[in-house]
C-alpha cells in the first residue's frame, strides 16, 4: 500500500507524469472542463472535498513553479485569495477568469472538487525539484 499522503491513484499518476511547465488545474465544482482534457472528478457533495484540502494534498507531491488564479477571486473569494497569496507568494500570478479557462485547455488534467465558493480555481505549473 502507498505510504505517502496522496492516496488517489488518478491524481497520483497525473502528478508523477508531469514534466517541467506542465499544467494541472484544481477546480471548484463549476469550472467548465474542456473536451480533451483529463477530468478527475472527486466531488462528492457540496463542499466535499474542499478546494483547500485538495490543493494542500496535491502540494505534498507536486513542486510548483507558478500558480495562476483569476483576478475575480480577489473580490469574490478574498479569504481564499489571501490564503493562496501567503502560500505561493511571488509564484502567484493573477489573470482574468476568461484567460484561466483558456489556459485550462492546455492542462494535463483538471481535478474537480466539491468546492462551492466562487472562483476557487487554480492552475499549477509544474516546477523542477533539482
Curated annotation (Swiss-Prot):
Q: Tell me the GO molecular function terms.
A: D-ribose pyranase activity; intramolecular lyase activity; monosaccharide binding
- Enzyme class name: isomerase
Q: Which reaction does it catalyse?
A: beta-D-ribopyranose = beta-D-ribofuranose
Name the gene.
rbsD
What's a single GO CC term here? cytosol
Name the Gene3D superfamilies on file.
Answer: RbsD-like domain
Q: What NCBIfam families would the database entry show?
A: PRK11797.1
Q: Which UniProt keywords apply?
A: Carbohydrate metabolism, Cytoplasm, Isomerase
Q: What is its EC number?
A: 5.4.99.62
* Major localization class: cytoplasm
**Subunit info?**
Homodecamer.
Q: What is the designated name of this protein?
A: D-ribose pyranase
Pathway note: Carbohydrate metabolism; D-ribose degradation; D-ribose 5-phosphate from beta-D-ribopyranose: step 1/2
Could you mention a single GO BP entry for this protein?
D-ribose catabolic process
List of residues binding substrate: 28, 97, 119-121
Protein family (similarity comment): Belongs to the RbsD / FucU family. RbsD subfamily.
Record organism: Thermoanaerobacter pseudethanolicus (strain ATCC 33223 / 39E)
The cellular location(s) given in this protein's UniProt record come to: Cytoplasm
Described function:
Catalyzes the interconversion of beta-pyran and beta-furan forms of D-ribose.
| InterPro entries per record | D-ribose_pyranase, RbsD-like_sf, RbsD_FucU
Provide the active-site residues from the annotation: 20 (proton donor)
